[in-house]
């Protein structure tokens, strides 16, 4: 499917697909009309990459993760390590946001009490 169709179907902005292709994370094929075409499997990987980026994984780490995935089952341990590190960072962010929310709630209670 072409860039726009892929973007609509998978809710991936065309700019993001271009970024992934420029960084070797996504391979497309040139159609006779000059448009880029992407397969279903490649787009599913792009969706996973987007989730990982939204979770805080940096592009360089994402590229490393993708290279490891291409190497197969021998790299499962390293990929798990990267995912666990990403998860740990997410939990820390959640904790910090919860602390900020607790402070705001405290200030609200204080103002209501006056």
Residue ranges with predicted function:
Residues 27-33, 37:
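Beta-hairpin "wing" of winged helix-turn-helix
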Residues 19:
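DNA-binding alpha-helical recognition surfaces that contact promoter or target DNA
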Residues 2-8, 22, 27, 40-114:
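Arg/Lys-rich, alpha-helical DNA-contact motif
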Residues 10-11, 34:
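Conserved beta-strand-loop-alpha-helix junction that forms the acyl-donor binding cleft
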Residues 6, 13-16:
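Short glycine/proline-centered loop/turn elements that form peptide/ligand docking sites
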């Amino acid at each position: 499917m072409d860039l726009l169709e892929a973007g609509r179907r998978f809710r991936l902005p065309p700019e993001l697909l271009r970024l992934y292709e420029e960084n070797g994370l996504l391979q497309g094929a040139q159609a006779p009309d000059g448009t880029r075409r992407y397969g279903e499997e490649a787009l599913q990987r792009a969706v996973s990459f987007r989730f990982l980026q939204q979770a805080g994984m940096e592009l360089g780490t994402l590229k490393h993760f993708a290279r490891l995935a291409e190497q197969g089952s021998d790299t499962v341990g390293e990929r798990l390590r990267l995912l666990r590190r990403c998860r740990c960072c997410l939990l820390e962010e959640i904790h910090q946001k919860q602390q900020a929310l607790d402070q705001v709630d405290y200030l609200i209670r204080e103002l209501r009490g006056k």
